[in-house]
Amino acid sequence: MDKYALLQRAKLHLDFIHANSTTHSFLFGALAELLDNARDAGAVRLDVFSVDNETLQGGFMLCFLDDGCGMSPDEASDVIYFGTSKKRLSTLKFIGQYGNGLKSGSMRIGKDCILFTKKEETMTCLFFSQTFCEKEGLTEVVVPIPSWLTRTRESITDDPQKFFTELSIIFKYSPFKTEAELMQQFDMIYGRCGTLLIIYNLKLLLSGEPELDVTTDKEDILMAEAPEEIPERRSFRAYTAVLYFEPRMKIFIQAKRVQTKHLCYSLYKPRKYQYTTSSFKGKFKTEVQKAEEAVKRAELLFKEVQAKVNQPDRIALSSTQDALQKALQDVDTKHKSLRQKQRALRKARTLSLFFGVNTEDQHQAGMFIYSNNRLIKMYEKVGPQLKMKSLLGAGIIGIVNIPLETMEPSHNKQEFLNVQEYNHLLKVMGQYLIQYCKDIGISNRNLTLFWDEFKYQHSKDTDSSLESLQWRRRQAMGIPFILQCDLCLKWRVLPSSSNYQEKGLPDLWICASNPNNLENSCNQIERLPSIPLGTVNRRPPSKDERERQLQESVQRYQDKLVEAQPQKSQLIVTSKIPEFKSSCLSSALKEKSKLGRIQPSGADLTQGSPSSVKLSFMQRSQKRSTEDTHSDVEFICMTKIPKKSVKKTVKYLQPGHAPALLENLKLEDTAQVSSREIKKQQSESLVQAGKASTDVASSRDPTVTMVWDQSSTKVSLKQEEEEEVPLIKPDKQELCDDTPVVKGNSSALHWKSLPGVQMEDLSPRSGHKINSVSGDCQLPASPMPSQSMSVEETARKLLSNLREILLYFVPEFQLSSEFECTSVEELITNPELERCPENINEKLKTCFNQIQNIYMAQYEKRLKRKMQSIVYEANRRGLLNQVFLGQCELKRKRTEEKLSDLRAKLALLLQKLQLGGPAGDPQQIDAYLEDLLKEDRLPTALHEKSPESA
């Protein structure tokens, strides 16, 4: 680094102290930074209290005292550096990561602070003062750090002059004017280790009052001029109660214990949802980039060393070979680390989302976002809570604890660095909020009834007689009452029969005070209530959504038609349609038969009286195989006709026309014609058929009929037609018939697609003439709309199976770049997959090919390795069991030998005591001893034997 000795270096200016503190827009967030330091230090107890001192700005000092691990003089010296922290390198999950919380948090509250810490046999004082630097005219930050020995109270210094200067600065600019007063502050740390932080010269409001109010409530620290709607934004006691996801530290504010909340178990009807995603990759991407840079540096270093070794004029030394070997090992290590980080990047992660109802106040609702057990955001509105007039989601609290590696918080721990990922999380939680409301049965209809049960919570004139009622209702609702032990810090569930609510919660509570005998000892494990899992069912689309999807599908299809052939729709004025000759109509039929379609001919649509319109239906012979039964539907849009002049009858083909028609139908329908010619011929023939299909005598005004050709095989018009029919109301308007022309023997006339034809008009009793159809032409049963529903259900199941397959494979394997999706979440949640599957058929084919050729092959290899490891482990355990069995057998034999020797010695003893000698059989010896003990002869014999021996 000597080559950079002459270069300029950045310096920390005094003004940065104030600028750094302004990152805390929320004042309690600055206080929380100091609580985080105590928690990271392993403190069991933390006291936050104020000490009055009228000589100081603000009128009091704010003190933080904990019993954590404390700091040595060297560790205290590291505190003054900005942006460095050993916590980041630790394997433990510390809240602090940036090395900035103490400086930014304390300087946000006041201008000066002094820190006293004890660790092992040393005591250290750290004086961090803006007032001192400003009055001395310093532009840099100067921090005195004197130290003493704990037992002798002697200074730890190699330079007495430096120690004297540090003390003189502290005596002049701190509230403590002598060394004895400094020692008194060390004595406040009641253990062998701990830390005391004192902040003074507090910052003021424009009114001249301090930002923190310690006079209004003697047992709390309030934020001055803060709104009172949300207690956590005004009361520091209420804020610290929910500050940590899993509270493991006793907090005392103004000498009174804070009743911390395990928020997940303090709500009504809690539910837990498992959200699996691979979208949150912010920090993992950074780690992969760092690992890639490390690999590049290691490879570059290896090449440099290798180049030195391979020089022809250089003698190979052992040191050079060792350096080359170390460089190679470093490259392998860096590659291994890179592969691990890449696997971590691809791995899907599961977040536990908790939801419950806050019955105390329905206006206190929103999401609590924790990061590494520390509260970052609270009461974040999501989903229906964002709507001003919506009551759905009122009073519902959502909770999520995000690991540090999944989503990284900002330096002030009040925001998240990746705003896009955070907004995505809020969107997901809004979706789960709606699902939670469904799971517990809350909807817009019964919200009023639901909250009427908790009106007693909002009554301001509640008397004491209702307090017990509140408690009983709270227990009846199933909200568990849990307390934290002051010794082991475990949470215990109290039975409903306990009367702590009526007497008030004690400041000191231990497990031995628990009425539950199963959890009245600190040695017993912590048993928290189980939170039921919520259900995430795929909800069926509503009627409005189905209509919207249908309209979008029709619009997409029409856009395709316009792109393929702009002149696709024609307006036909029926009053100006001339009559066609039979030859023209037969030629039109011949063209349609070549294309494989059947349309009504104008010759069969004969003119009748003005009060009747004759319809003709034709059906192909059942000579086609089932492979060619795909039906294409062509229809004429319904035309509005006056009700008085319209009367419908049904008449089939006349026998004279049937043979000619059947001959035309026998033509080969698979001729290869270009798509444009097919569409043109279809359009012309359809227009001709439409011109001959309508003739209304009594209608003077011209009637406009719009003809559409829907011959695309990508969109199932049969489903769209069946979904559109129920939307037409026959009682409001009279419409002409939809005339579907169907090819193939699997299709038939949709009676429900003829809203103008009454079913009784088609019966023989109605007076209409119905002729039979000769040959194989018959009228099959009408397919029901359930067919389209079954198709939709089948498609839904297929998509569901595809999602399951992708979610199974993709977390471990790469997603192909052909999908144009960065993650599997974007692919499986793509709405185009459901609304327009025809546009991504190629992608689906690629997906299935990749699953079959790549994923399954890799899966089989992994499964084979896993089975081999299982077989190896089973064989190894079998050998171990055999060895263990042999050892047990040897022990058994030794035990039997010892037992036989003992029985023999016992038989000799009984003979000496003249109590008889049992036989050598072990069972007989045991039986003889039992009889001897029952007769009480043994004590008597021993008593008689003792005088004789004496």
From Swiss-Prot:
The keyword Nucleus applies. The keyword Zinc-finger applies. PROSITE patterns: ZF_CW. It comes from Mus musculus (Mouse). A zinc finger (CW-type) spans 465-530. It comes from the Eukaryota. Disruption phenotype: Mice show progressive loss of spermatogonia and male infertility. Spermatogenesis is blocked early in meiosis I. Male germ cells show derepression of transposable elements (TEs) and DNA hypomethylation of TEs. Mice display increased depressive-like behavior whereas no behavioral abnormalities regarding locomotor activity or anxiety-like behavior are detectable and BDNF levels in the hippocampus are up-regulated. This is MORC family CW-type zinc finger protein 1. Residues 281-342, 885-916 form a coiled coil. Zn(2+) binds at C485, C488, C511, C522. The gene is Morc1. GO terms for biological process: behavioral fear response; cell differentiation; epigenetic programing of male pronucleus; epigenetic regulation of gene expression; negative regulation of DNA-templated transcription initiation; negative regulation of gene expression; regulatory ncRNA-mediated gene silencing; retrotransposition. Expressed at very low level in male germ cells. GO terms for cellular component: male germ cell nucleus; nucleus.
